[in-house]
C-alpha cells in the first residue's frame, strides 16, 4: 500500500505480493502503525498493473471505498473468473484494466450500480460481450 493523501487518510493498493496468488481481497481499510500508534486508512484505488500477469488469480473482491481501478490492473490474469465489486463509488476503470482475463468472467456489482458500471466496463477496459456484469 502507498499513502495517497495523509490528511484524508487514503491509500492505494500498489501490487500483489506474489504473482502466484489464487484470490485477492482489496479491503475497505487498512491499519498502519507509526510511532506505536495505529491509524486507519481507506483504500481508495488499485494501482496500474497491480495484479497484471497473476496467471493463477481466480477471484477478486474489491472493497467498499475503492474509487478507481488503474490501467492494466488485472491484465493478463487469464484465470480470473470472478470479480466482486463492493464499492458504490467506483468512478474510473483504466484502459485495459481487465484485458486478458477469463473470457467468460463474471463481474458482480450489486443491483444499484449495475447500469452505471455497465458504462465503466467497456471495450476500452478489456470488457468482452462473453463476460457478464451482474447484480
Language model features with spans:
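A short acidic, amphipathic alpha-helical/loop segment
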Residues: 96-97, 120
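GGW-centered surface loops in extracellular recognition modules
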Residues: 1-17, 121, 126
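Structural signature of tandem-repeat unit edges
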Residues: 3-8, 19-45, 54-68, 78-92, ...
Amino acid at each position: 500500500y502507498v499513502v495517497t493523501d495523509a490528511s484524508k487518510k487514503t491509500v492505494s493498493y500498489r501490487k500483489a505480493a506474489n504473482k502466484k496468488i489464487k484470490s485477492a481481497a482489496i479491503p475497505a481499510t487498512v491499519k498502519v502503525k507509526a510511532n506505536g500508534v495505529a491509524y486507519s486508512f481507506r483504500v481508495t484505488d488499485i494501482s496500474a498493473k497491480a495484479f497484471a500477469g497473476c496467471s493463477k488469480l481466480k477471484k477478486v473482491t474489491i472493497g467498499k471505498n475503492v474509487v478507481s481501478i488503474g490501467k492494466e490492473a488485472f491484465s493478463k490474469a487469464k484465470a480470473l473468473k470472478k470479480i466482486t465489486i463492493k464499492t458504490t463509488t467506483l468512478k474510473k476503470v483504466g484502459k485495459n484494466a481487465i484485458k486478458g482475463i477469463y473470457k467468460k468472467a463474471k463481474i458482480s456489482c450489486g443491483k444499484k450500480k449495475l447500469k452505471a458500471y455497465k458504462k465503466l466496463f467497456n471495450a476500452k477496459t478489456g470488457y468482452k460481450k462473453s463476460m457478464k456484469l451482474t447484480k
